[in-house]
A protein has these predicted regions:
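Glycine-rich flexible loops
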Residues: 1-170
Length: 170
């Protein structure tokens, strides 16, 4: 059994422009084993997700829709999404006639607090959760699945926000 290691972009590097030679390898206690740079403050949260879900990859974004909706639904049990065809792109969902709930945890500067807050929801979360006022974490069996889950959840969050804006204007 190999000890857990993550391949990740170091802190301070533009994640949209990161090159393979800039990536670092981090162990289960956030020590950099290979590469130049420092592990980000959020490394321990990524580790917590991998340990709980057996994910092969974890991705994180800071979209407008995810950030705004996470604040709006904070304390309301998450963001309900149902009836959208795109739900079928999430692992385990076979029909659009499905309802999911994206969990939201309150933001904290303590990654330990964030990890403890999301831990009870990780097994049942639909491949992702939101940190209120911050952004979306999504995961999957590998990088491709994680990217698919991230893109689908971001799409559904944008749909939800647009739906709310239309309802408000009507």
């Amino acid at each position: 059994h190999q000890p857990l290691q993550l391949l990740m972009a170091p802190s301070g590097v533009d994640k949209g422009q990161v090159r393979a030679d800039q990536l670092i390898v981090v162990d289960q206690i956030c020590n950099v084993l290979q590469g130049e740079g420092k592990a980000s403050a959020e490394t321990s949260l990524h580790l917590r997700i991998v340990e709980a879900t057996q994910a092969g990859a974890v991705l994180h974004t800071h979209s407008v829709a995810g950030t705004v909706l996470s604040r709006h639904y904070e304390g309301k049990g998450g963001i309900p999404l149902e009836g959208w065809e795109m739900l079928k792109g999430l692992v385990g969902i076979k029909t659009h006639a499905t309802s999911i709930n994206i969990p939201i945890i309150s933001n904290s500067q303590s990654m330990q607090e964030l990890g403890n807050a999301i831990a009870p929801s990780l097994k049942s979360a639909p491949c992702g959760f939101l940190v209120a006022g911050h952004g979306l974490y999504a995961w999957g069996a590998d990088l491709e699945a994680s990217k698919q889950h991230l893109e689908i959840l971001e799409f559904l969050l944008k749909v939800k926000l647009t739906q709310m804006q239309i309802a408000h204007q009507s």
